[in-house]
């Protein structure tokens, strides 16, 4: 609710007051600091990691939602409420300045009921997939609680190590602590 009240609503109201029409997708890059919520950026596009997580939670048809928005209709957006999704980005060594490329990647098609693996900076090589950018993969763990989703994502990463890559080990930690209060 804080995000809606302090970021979204004032932004939309300011755009209306300035006569700035907009139809599309806007996402706010936010950070929670010791001094509270801070806006880092606004983007008029889908952000990859954010969208990959949100799409797992969205029950509505995205194409229909976009069509409704473009045609001036109020979209019906339904979200799954019986599960959580947590995404961890796997980045190439050297990211963001000079990411290593051509890192051999494991078989991403192997079945895993607990996680969805999204490829990002990836290309086909003669022996399989190779890294081709800074952000290589997103591992999306799903669970009945945020803690369960986090556990599944990190369990997958531990069981499938990739040389010359790294990922943050604290994704979801603050939210989990906050929801446990």
At which residue positions do the language-model features occur?
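A cross-kingdom feature marking charged/low-complexity
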Residues: 171-181
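Short arginine-rich
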Residues: 155-171
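Active-site "cap" helix and flanking loop/linker of ATP-utilizing ligase/carboxylase catalytic domains
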Residues: 4-27, 43-114
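Short, well-ordered alpha-helical segments
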Residues: 139-158
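N-terminal loops that bind phosphate or other acidic moieties
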Residues: 1
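Generic long, charged, amphipathic alpha-helical segments
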Residues: 101-138
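Short beta-strand elements
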Residues: 28-32, 37-46, 121
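Short, well-ordered beta-strand elements
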Residues: 40-42, 135-142
């Amino acid at each position: 609710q804080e995000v809606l009240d302090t970021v979204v609503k004032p932004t939309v109201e300011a755009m209306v007051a300035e006569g700035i029409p907009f139809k599309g997708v806007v996402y706010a890059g936010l950070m929670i600091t010791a001094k509270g919520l801070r806006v880092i950026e606004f983007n008029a596009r889908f952000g990859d990691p954010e969208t990959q997580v949100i799409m797992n939670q969205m029950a509505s048809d995205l194409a229909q939602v976009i069509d409704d928005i473009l045609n001036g209709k109020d979209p019906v957006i339904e979200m799954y409420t019986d599960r959580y999704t947590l995404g961890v980005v796997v980045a190439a060594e050297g990211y963001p300045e000079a990411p290593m490329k051509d890192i051999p990647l494991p078989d991403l098609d192997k079945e895993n009921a607990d996680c969805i693996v999204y490829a990002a900076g990836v290309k086909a090589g003669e022996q399989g997939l190779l890294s081709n950018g800074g952000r290589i993969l997103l591992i999306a763990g799903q669970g009945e609680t945020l803690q369960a989703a986090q556990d599944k994502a990190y369990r997958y990463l531990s069981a499938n190590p990739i040389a010359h890559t790294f990922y943050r080990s604290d994704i979801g930690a603050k939210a989990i602590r906050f929801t446990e209060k």
